[in-house]
Amino acid sequence: MATLYDVPPEELIEALTETLADEDDIEAPDWAEFTKTGVDRELPPEQEDFWTRRAASLLRKVAVDGPVGVNALRSEYGTSKQGTTRYRVRPHQKTKGSGNIIRTALQQLEDAGYVETSENDGRRVTGDGRSLLDDTAGDLLTELDRPELERYA
């Protein structure tokens, strides 16, 4: 039985994106197409499936690091900034990602039943969320044709 730790994260997030795209509870809000993903960005994301991709990434991060709060996830999705994007004029300064995007996506994952709020600890994955991750990882492991992953099958 494969778990989410047995497959590469990029492929798992890609497969979860396709799975979460079919969910009714997970869809981008109206404001999402105009919102930057952090202070260090100049423009909103250009990907069509950005919202479901971020939700899939959040689901994996909560499963690996959970229970985890929004502030810790903001730090995970942040980057470093050296002044404006055009003029790199100062030393690196760590900035955080957008809390509203993370919070709203987590609330949608809660509505779908994949994440729950634990008291005073943040959010953690439910049994349904863990089984979705592990089932997706198992399907992905059989699809991937990579010799280094054969020992997990």
From Swiss-Prot:
Q: Which GO terms describe its cellular component?
A: cytosolic small ribosomal subunit
Question: Matching PROSITE patterns, A to Z?
Answer: RIBOSOMAL_S19E (PS00628)
Describe the protein's quaternary organization and the partners it interacts with: Part of the 30S ribosomal subunit.
Supply the Pfam families for this chain: Ribosomal_S19e
What HAMAP family does the database record attribute to this sequence? Ribosomal_eS19
Please give the name of this protein. Small ribosomal subunit protein eS19
Species of the source: Haloarcula marismortui (strain ATCC 43049 / DSM 3752 / JCM 8966 / VKM B-1809)
Query: What biological function has been recorded for the protein in this entry?
Result: May be involved in maturation of the 30S ribosomal subunit.
Q: List the GO molecular function terms.
A: RNA binding; structural constituent of ribosome
- Composition-biased stretches, type Basic and acidic residues, lie in 120-133
Q: Which InterPro entries match?
A: Ribosomal_eS19, Ribosomal_eS19_archaeal, Ribosomal_eS19_CS, WH-like_DNA-bd_sf, WH_DNA-bd_sf
Q: Show the NCBIfam families listed in the entry.
A: PRK09333.1
- Top-level taxon of origin: Archaea
Q: What SMART domains does this protein's entry cite?
A: Ribosomal_S19e
Gene name, Swiss-Prot/TrEMBL: rps19e
Question: Which segments carry the region annotation Disordered?
Answer: 77-99, 113-139
